Design a protein with these regions (language model features):
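A short helix-loop
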Residues: 3, 7-11, 18, 27-29, ...
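Alpha-helix C-terminal capping segments
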Residues: 97-109
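Short beta-strand-loop/turn "lid" adjacent to the catalytic site in phosphate-handling enzymes
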Residues: 64-100
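Conserved phosphate-binding catalytic cores of ATP/NTP-utilizing and phosphoryl-transfer enzymes
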Residues: 1-3, 108-135
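Acidic, glycine-rich active-site loops and adjacent beta-strand->loop/helix elements
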Residues: 14, 78-83, 114-120, 143
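Short glycine-rich, Thr/Ser-proximal phosphate-binding strand/loop in the N-terminal lobe
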Residues: 11-50, 155-156
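Short, well-ordered amphipathic alpha-helical segments that serve as non-catalytic structural scaffolds
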Residues: 30-32, 51-66
């Protein structure tokens, strides 16, 4: 029987629930983009929380068939955006509350992490990096930063003080008439452009 960790991440624009084996194999990842009206450049935090609360049960129902024959060893939640002491966004409370509740019901540990650490961990998995210290360039909607990771310690080395890379992508996409967040839609256009040559 596979032992899995159930992960929750409720960021500004995506509700995510996943199951990963304790060895690091992704069993399933269930995500839903939050709806943003065409032409708009985001949601208020209260709207984001409302959408996450509605989407989380559906994501868990979607995940359930993949983990029926698994033992849930732990739960992990993105409780805030970054490792900074003042890092806070209400949207993260939806996944944090759901995850902590699930862990309590199952009698398993619940580990708290940050959305930023999740991005870095995903990049490590995708690139095949298992262990070791690294430099990470974190480009997202809310951050454009250079970080050093030594062991588990993240140190901010620098970043932008103005517009973040993700904001540029989203604003460009919205100006082109694409839905927000525009990253996935621009990526699809780029792939189509390459295939049409």
């Amino acid at each position: 029987m596979k032992r899995v960790v159930i992960g929750f991440d409720t960021s500004c624009y995506t509700t995510s629930v996943a199951a990963v084996t304790v060895e690091g194999e992704v069993v399933a990842s269930c995500r839903k983009l939050l709806p943003v009206k065409l032409g708009e450049r985001g949601l208020r935090q209260s709207e984001g929380v409302w959408h996450h609360v509605r989407a989380l049960p559906e994501r868990l129902e979607e995940l359930a068939p993949y983990i029926r024959d698994c033992e849930i060893a732990a739960v992990c939640v993105s409780a805030r955006p970054r490792d900074e002491a003042d890092s806070y966004m209400p949207v993260f409370h939806a996944g944090d509350a759901q995850g902590r509740g699930l862990a309590a019901m199952l009698g398993v540990p619940c580990f708290s992490t940050t959305h930023q650490r999740g991005h870095i961990a995903a990049a490590k998995v995708d690139s095949g990096i298992v262990d070791g210290d690294l430099l990470a360039v974190h480009l997202s909607g809310g951050t454009t930063e250079l970080l050093s990771q030594v062991g588990e310690e993240l140190t901010l080395l620098g970043g932008t003080l103005d517009l973040h890379a993700g904001q540029v992508v989203d604003r460009t996409g919205v100006a082109m008439g694409l839905p927000f967040p525009a990253g996935p839609h621009l990526e699809k256009l780029a792939v189509q452009g390459r295939s049409e040559g």
